[in-house]
Structures are given as structure tokens and as C-alpha cells.
């Protein structure tokens, strides 16, 4: 199990390096890297399924800590899958904007010799307006995607906290921890839950304000 865990963890780190490369590539060059990332995510998820089976072969005294490590891998992979989807949508928008811009430019150059100055100025204005509108839409989409990623991250953390609470209770019963120690641990979990709820509320408010002011 240890060998497969470290192998999967290395795949996750490799995917993170691919994302760093992705931010430096053009829209056309990004496609191959995105496909490579998807293959690695699929492979890592398959490894996690195997790790879930191997957990039952781990000694009971080590099973809880091993499960926590596997759960962390799953959480990282969910986050990477969301990031990949966001990157794909961003690339598609960039390619669409490039295509529309080229169409406007070609239309402008075709009409340049035959149309009067007023028409050329109108085409220049339309091109500038289209560029500004595309930038605004891309900014809104990026903010919404970023907010969605944050919300998904918070939800995943909430699920992780809930699972951790149950595992801590099980470990406490096994190890015979005192009631005072268990109460301290539960108090910390309650504080983490309040932080989670506050984070969700603040994130939703920020997204709502951004959309409101951009629409005005």
C-alpha cells in the first residue's frame, strides 16, 4: 500500500507542475497539456480506488491514519479536476474571442478600400467595443469560476471535518482518551465548522457584489 500511495502522491505533484506550465502556454498549445492532465487524474483516481481496498489489509492500529492520507489524495484530485475544468473553459473563451476578433479584422480590411471614413470609424468602434466586452465577460467568468472553486473547496473541507470528527471519536474510544480531552477536540471541531460557515457566507457576498457592480 505504501508504494502505491507514494506513486499516486507523485502523480498529484506532477499534475500540479503541469498546471504551472499551462498558465504559460497559448490557447492552442494548452490542449495537449490539458489532455495529459486528465489522463493523470484518471490514473490517480483509479489508484485511490485500489488504496480503498488495500486499507482493509492494514493493521487496525494504522488504518485510521492511512485512511486520512487516502482521503487527502481524493480531496486534492477533486480540486485538480475542478481547476482543469476551469482552465478548459478559459481556453475555449480565449479561442472564441480570437476567432471573433479575426473575423472583425477581416471584415474591416475587406471594406476598407470601398467604404467611406465614417464606416471605417464605425468598424473601429465595434472592434474596440467587442474587445472590451470580451474582457469584461472573461473577468466575470473568471471571478465566478474562482468563487465556485472556493465554495467547492469549503464544502470538501466541511465533509472532511465531519469525517474527521467521527474518526476522532472512534480513535478516542479505542485509546481511552479522557472526557476532558475529547471535549477539547470537539470544541475545536465546532470552531472549525463556524469558520467554514463564515467562509461560505463571505464568499457568496463577494461574488454577489462583484456581479452587481459589473452589471451596472
Swiss-Prot record:
It is found in: Golgi apparatus, cis-Golgi network membrane; Golgi apparatus membrane; Endoplasmic reticulum membrane. This is Probable Golgi SNAP receptor complex member 2. One of its GO terms (molecular function) is SNARE binding. CDD domains: SNARE_GS27. Residues 216 are vesicular. Belongs to the GOSR2 family. It comes from the Eukaryota. Keywords: Coiled coil, Endoplasmic reticulum, Golgi apparatus, Membrane, Protein transport, Transmembrane, Transmembrane helix, Transport. Pfam families: V-SNARE_C. Residues 1-194 are cytoplasmic. Part of a unique SNARE complex. Involved in transport of proteins from the cis/medial-Golgi to the trans-Golgi network. Residues 62-103 form a coiled coil. The chain crosses the membrane at residues 195-215. One of its GO terms (biological process) is vesicle-mediated transport. GO terms for cellular component: endoplasmic reticulum membrane; ER to Golgi transport vesicle membrane; Golgi apparatus; Golgi membrane; late endosome membrane; SNARE complex. It is a single-pass type IV membrane protein.
